[in-house]
């Protein structure tokens, strides 16, 4: 018992360090995504770092959000956005994609093609499954909205496979992980075409 009492402070410190590491991992995963968060935690990232990757780019956007925002309280509109993102970004995460950023009422995500990971076919299949899942989730959310007498939400999803620069950009004090390149622009353009379909 005396021996345990002597090592207790060291064991307590180890437990605190492990708890802090777990907290850091959870925060980085939540704010940066799993892949980017792991790189930051291990010190592999500095501003301007990037690599060319092949990935399915996912871009989704909520329709008519400005009139919605103008007709609702801030709290209600933020709740609506969270419900919407839970459906769309939640589907991305549940199918092992990585959400890179939320841009107002839009989201950008990737399904990367990697050695030892997904092939192009597998990345495309995962992205399409996520899109179908998102459609089902939004259909359920819209059924709930209609049962409360509110209009259904419109949205679009654009998917495109291509090469992009994946890395971080920003200032010395604030950086952000993103993808840049023609494939990312194409995904956004494809999503925009959903408005007329």
Language model region names:
Residues 2-52:
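Regulatory cytosolic signal-relay segments
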Residues 4-8, 74, 127, 183:
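Short, charged, low-complexity patches
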Residues 44-129, 177:
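Catalytic NTP-binding/metal-coordinating core of nucleotidyl cyclase/transferase enzymes
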Residues 57, 107, 155-161:
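A structural signal for short, well-ordered beta-strand segments
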Residues 82-97, 113, 117-157, 182-193:
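Alpha-helical scaffold within the catalytic cores of cyclic-nucleotide enzymes
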Residues 164, 193-197:
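Cytosolic regulatory/linker segments at or just downstream of nucleotide-handling modules
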Residues 168-171:
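Cytochrome P450 core scaffold surrounding the K-helix E-X-X-R motif
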């Amino acid at each position: 018992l005396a021996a345990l009492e002597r090592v207790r402070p060291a064991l307590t410190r180890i437990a605190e360090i492990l708890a802090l590491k777990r907290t850091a991992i959870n925060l980085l995963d939540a704010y940066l995504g799993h892949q980017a968060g792991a790189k930051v935690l291990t010190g592999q990232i500095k501003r301007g770092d990037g690599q060319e990757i092949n990935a399915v780019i996912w871009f989704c956007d909520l329709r008519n959000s400005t009139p919605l925002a103008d007709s609702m309280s801030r709290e209600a509109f933020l709740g609506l956005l969270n419900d919407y993102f839970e459906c769309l970004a939640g589907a991305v995460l549940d199918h092992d994609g990585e959400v890179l950023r939320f841009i107002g009422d839009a989201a950008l995500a990737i399904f990367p093609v990697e050695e030892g990971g997904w092939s192009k076919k597998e990345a495309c299949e995962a992205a399409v499954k996520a899109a179908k899942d998102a459609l089902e989730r939004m259909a359920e959310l819209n059924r709930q909205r209609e049962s409360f007498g509110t209009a259904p939400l419109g949205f679009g999803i654009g998917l495109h496979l291509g090469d992009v620069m994946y890395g971080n950009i920003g200032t010395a004090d604030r950086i952000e992980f993103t993808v840049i390149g023609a494939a990312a622009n194409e995904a956004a353009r494809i999503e925009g075409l959903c408005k007329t379909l």
